[in-house]
Amino acid sequence: MSKRDYYEVLGVSRDTSEREIKKAYKRLAMKFHPDRNPGDKTAEANFKEIKEAYEILTDADKKAAYDQFGHAGVDPNRGGGGYGGGQGDFGDIFGDVFGDIFGGGRRGGQRQAARGSDLRYNLELSLEEAVKGLTKELRIPTLATCDLCEGSGAKKGTSATTCGTCHGQGQVQMRQGFFAVQQPCPTCHGRGKIIKDPCSKCHGDGRVEKSKTLSVKIPAGVDTGDRIRLAGEGEAGEFGAPPGDLYVQVSVREHAIFVRDGNNLYCEVPISFSKAALGGEIEVPTLDGKVSLKIPAETQTGRMFRLRGKGVKSVRSHAVGDLLCKVVMETPVNLNDRQKELLREFEATLTGESKKHSPKAEGFFDGVKKFFQDLNS
């Protein structure tokens, strides 16, 4: 009996993508799979036909031969190593195609030992430490490779054997009606190996709890939220697998004087009324020590002064930020009688000349006066 066209079997056109061919196959395979149609010979024949068409049209070489020569190009009886046909195994083909949907499908080879877990260490620094950089000694609790069994988990002189239930895969396939579900092997608990004589130190795990001390170089310029990766310093992998990594998470404590914003530092510097009015020099703090700052006469409170290059050196670009100092005029307190008298005398000298000496205040009170006039008009 002549075979149907493979494209017709799957209900697709000749220019259909492989992805669409797979989608068509999945839809038809679900419909005609023998598990869904027990005892139905027609459904079984249809499934074989669908499976054959799928295997040809998803193999680039076989598809090219079929497109050029038709069924003769993939007929094994005509020589040339064409399509091998055969009944095949319903469970195998179904598991391969639907494995991504139902959680696994077939696995080739034995289960690989798991890589060690990554670790996180929260490191708090002062602003000075973060800006200048330093080397820190960190004590890290972790899982290390057992030195008695060298990570095998087995008693010295013995070795683990491949699990006979899952054949080293660590999982077994449980068929539940139409579906095939992968589950951890109940015999080896997902390891793929059986340890008959476990190590007396690690009790078969291959790893032991241990604390280690690491000398970690913290680069200058780090800030809160930065993370330093130390490759291979995480937990040991199981049974000789590679270790995980250690991530040092940086946070910087608040400073009593400075506030950091990126590479710039900010601070407030109090000045006296007389210094603001007459000008002069004041000392301001930096992370490198005190420096002199010249205050011009008639400086108003809140004025910002920039000290270039006195900020933070970027850990990435190596550009250096600035220190921005905001002067805040401090009202004198705890005045004695003489000081109060001098201030009254000074206040008296300003009478009638407020516009000249306090232009902002004069403008403010003029605005208030106009506001009430408009309100009452």
From Swiss-Prot:
<dbReference type="GO" id="GO:0009408">
    <property type="term" value="P:response to heat"/>
</dbReference>
<dbReference type="InterPro" id="IPR036410">
    <property type="entry name" value="HSP_DnaJ_Cys-rich_dom_sf"/>
</dbReference>
<dbReference type="GO" id="GO:0031072">
    <property type="term" value="F:heat shock protein binding"/>
</dbReference>
<keyword id="KW-0143">Chaperone</keyword>
<feature type="binding site">
    <location>
        <position position="163"/>
    </location>
    <ligand>
        <name>Zn(2+) 2</name>
    </ligand>
</feature>
<keyword id="KW-0235">DNA replication</keyword>
<feature type="repeat" description="CXXCXGXG motif">
    <location>
        <begin position="146"/>
        <end position="153"/>
    </location>
</feature>
<feature type="binding site">
    <location>
        <position position="188"/>
    </location>
    <ligand>
        <name>Zn(2+) 2</name>
    </ligand>
</feature>
<dbReference type="InterPro" id="IPR036869">
    <property type="entry name" value="J_dom_sf"/>
</dbReference>
<dbReference type="Pfam" id="PF01556">
    <property type="entry name" value="DnaJ_C"/>
</dbReference>
<protein>
    <recommendedName>
        <fullName>Chaperone protein DnaJ</fullName>
    </recommendedName>
</protein>
<feature type="binding site">
    <location>
        <position position="149"/>
    </location>
    <ligand>
        <name>Zn(2+) 1</name>
    </ligand>
</feature>
<dbReference type="InterPro" id="IPR001623">
    <property type="entry name" value="DnaJ_domain"/>
</dbReference>
<comment type="similarity">
    <text>Belongs to the DnaJ family.</text>
</comment>
<dbReference type="InterPro" id="IPR018253">
    <property type="entry name" value="DnaJ_domain_CS"/>
</dbReference>
<feature type="binding site">
    <location>
        <position position="185"/>
    </location>
    <ligand>
        <name>Zn(2+) 2</name>
    </ligand>
</feature>
<keyword id="KW-0346">Stress response</keyword>
<dbReference type="GO" id="GO:0006260">
    <property type="term" value="P:DNA replication"/>
</dbReference>
<feature type="zinc finger region" description="CR-type">
    <location>
        <begin position="133"/>
        <end position="211"/>
    </location>
</feature>
<keyword id="KW-0677">Repeat</keyword>
<dbReference type="GO" id="GO:0042026">
    <property type="term" value="P:protein refolding"/>
</dbReference>
<dbReference type="GO" id="GO:0051082">
    <property type="term" value="F:unfolded protein binding"/>
</dbReference>
<keyword id="KW-0963">Cytoplasm</keyword>
<keyword id="KW-0863">Zinc-finger</keyword>
<feature type="repeat" description="CXXCXGXG motif">
    <location>
        <begin position="185"/>
        <end position="192"/>
    </location>
</feature>
<dbReference type="GO" id="GO:0008270">
    <property type="term" value="F:zinc ion binding"/>
</dbReference>
<feature type="binding site">
    <location>
        <position position="166"/>
    </location>
    <ligand>
        <name>Zn(2+) 2</name>
    </ligand>
</feature>
<dbReference type="InterPro" id="IPR001305">
    <property type="entry name" value="HSP_DnaJ_Cys-rich_dom"/>
</dbReference>
<dbReference type="GO" id="GO:0051085">
    <property type="term" value="P:chaperone cofactor-dependent protein refolding"/>
</dbReference>
<dbReference type="Pfam" id="PF00684">
    <property type="entry name" value="DnaJ_CXXCXGXG"/>
</dbReference>
<dbReference type="GO" id="GO:0005737">
    <property type="term" value="C:cytoplasm"/>
</dbReference>
<keyword id="KW-0479">Metal-binding</keyword>
<dbReference type="Pfam" id="PF00226">
    <property type="entry name" value="DnaJ"/>
</dbReference>
<keyword id="KW-0862">Zinc</keyword>
<dbReference type="InterPro" id="IPR002939">
    <property type="entry name" value="DnaJ_C"/>
</dbReference>
<comment type="subunit">
    <text>Homodimer.</text>
</comment>
<dbReference type="InterPro" id="IPR008971">
    <property type="entry name" value="HSP40/DnaJ_pept-bd"/>
</dbReference>
<feature type="repeat" description="CXXCXGXG motif">
    <location>
        <begin position="199"/>
        <end position="206"/>
    </location>
</feature>
<comment type="function">
    <text>Participates actively in the response to hyperosmotic and heat shock by preventing the aggregation of stress-denatured proteins and by disaggregating proteins, also in an autonomous, DnaK-independent fashion. Unfolded proteins bind initially to DnaJ; upon interaction with the DnaJ-bound protein, DnaK hydrolyzes its bound ATP, resulting in the formation of a stable complex. GrpE releases ADP from DnaK; ATP binding to DnaK triggers the release of the substrate protein, thus completing the reaction cycle.</text>
</comment>
<dbReference type="InterPro" id="IPR012724">
    <property type="entry name" value="DnaJ"/>
</dbReference>
<feature type="domain" description="J">
    <location>
        <begin position="5"/>
        <end position="70"/>
    </location>
</feature>
<feature type="binding site">
    <location>
        <position position="146"/>
    </location>
    <ligand>
        <name>Zn(2+) 1</name>
    </ligand>
</feature>
